[in-house]
């Protein structure tokens, strides 16, 4: 018999009854029922009930066992007594009568229990992540993550993509966030950077004559903590294709993402024909560029009903042509208590309030806005929004560029409060026609709005003749249930167009050569039209595991202060190491 096991803890069935078996694993739970000990033994594969009574030669040692001790148990498989079977377990018809126990690894007192799913402070869970990972839900999430990555690889290869590994040590570049810098010992004063994405390398692969590239790529960004992103690193399904237009990328990617979602959605419906929503339309209807399409509420411009009306606050705003009034329908929200609750929520978000109209039985409007604009305008708003008695509408006004984010939050809040969001489906969509540039209010300059390597719609001619803020890019995102899960674009592969695009954003040709010299040189030697995208592995896994916390699908994540509490990173290093790197510390004063 094998030194440690003849079977795993998830393997035994009726067919093994009367066999002598050997199991090894962790003592998941130990119960004493009238002097008979029941030990639930757990390993990676499952759980088996082991029984020791006073007649067992191993009973004395069994009494000393504690939770999470690692043991080897020998015994005979037998059928559980009638009425004690556990249909929730694959091994639930069988138990092991214990004849021998060997303690392989005793455990100290546990800082958090493995049995059960009690909530514990996050810092404790991260410091003792090796215990946390033994817990059933987190353990299963990590296994699901591995299966999802396997599925991605298989489906990408079926689409004709080949897997490559691009460098981890690279050059620093202004792709968005701060780089993690790695000092060079051999070249004092110079630094490598960990890649924010394999962007330049994957484009260089297309210029090297390869046709369809992908990898599950680690990416590193020195960003301030955000609720929807783990600090430090994340993984993406990265891909690039040669001789393609936007529709070709869509045709290659949709079957992969749809297939992965359908495989792991546990029967929940998944969008088959993805809508394509222009960026501007997405802001106008949903107040976000990552809409949750499970929420049926659509915002509408109702400015005409307030222009010149008796509600002077909105009427005066509308004298400025850039201002608008948007309405968010609230079907079933036509009570004073609900409207007041929404108004209080808006004030909690830093807004002066949230105007509303309610419609009573009989169809008349109620509330301060209705009283000020009169019954005809109130009725016109009701008709435009398709509302009825018992419904409400909520209003935001001003410059849409300044209020659309809040309007989107209000739409989401209404959908949640009114129970309009179907949680049991996955709604996927393309967001297209992103603006190439945006105005940076802080720096008072035009900046790239997304990926600086995207092709402008209209090419070099658009860059030379159009107002930069009106130029659209061949840039696209995939959204699912309110999350951006992928982003990409058709690339700007002509060197003169690339230089012009960066010039508009304030970079001269010398800047381009200095920062992107390798790719710029490659553009001079025959660059094919190419495009691609990157899908966030972590977010996709998070959605498919039914959680909203990225730490619940990551092995050893950092906390929100970018600290690895298990390994003690970041840490101080020895003075000798700093001297070898020619680094002197200049720490901030407390």
UniProtKB/Swiss-Prot annotation:
Function: Aspartyl-tRNA synthetase with relaxed tRNA specificity since it is able to aspartylate not only its cognate tRNA(Asp) but also tRNA(Asn). Reaction proceeds in two steps: L-aspartate is first activated by ATP to form Asp-AMP and then transferred to the acceptor end of tRNA(Asp/Asn).
Taxonomic source organism: Nitrobacter winogradskyi (strain ATCC 25391 / DSM 10237 / CIP 104748 / NCIMB 11846 / Nb-255)
Aspartate as annotated region, ranges: 199-202
NCBIfam families the UniProt entry points to: aspS_bact, PRK00476.1
Residues annotated as binding L-aspartate: 175, 221, 450, 491
One GO MF term: aspartate-tRNA ligase activity
Protein name as it appears in the record: Aspartate--tRNA(Asp/Asn) ligase
HAMAP family named in the record: Asp_tRNA_synth_type1
Source species, domain of life: Bacteria
Protein family: Belongs to the class-II aminoacyl-tRNA synthetase family. Type 1 subfamily.
UniProt xrefs under Gene3D superfamilies: Bira Bifunctional Protein, Domain 2 (3.30.930.10), GAD-like domain (3.30.1360.30), Nucleic acid-binding proteins (2.40.50.140)
Enzyme class per UniProt: ligase
Site, Important for tRNA non-discrimination: residue positions: 33, 83
One of the Pfam families matching this protein, by short name: tRNA-synt_2
Keywords for the protein's UniProt record, in alphabetical order: Aminoacyl-tRNA synthetase, ATP-binding, Cytoplasm, Ligase, Nucleotide-binding, Protein biosynthesis
PROSITE patterns, per database record: AA_TRNA_LIGASE_II (PS50862)
Subcellular localization, as worded in the UniProt entry: Cytoplasm
GO CC terms of this entry: cytoplasm
Listed EC numbers: 6.1.1.23
The reaction(s) this protein catalyses: tRNA(Asx) + L-aspartate + ATP = L-aspartyl-tRNA(Asx) + AMP + diphosphate
Subunit structure: Homodimer.
Gene Ontology biological process terms in this record: aspartyl-tRNA aminoacylation
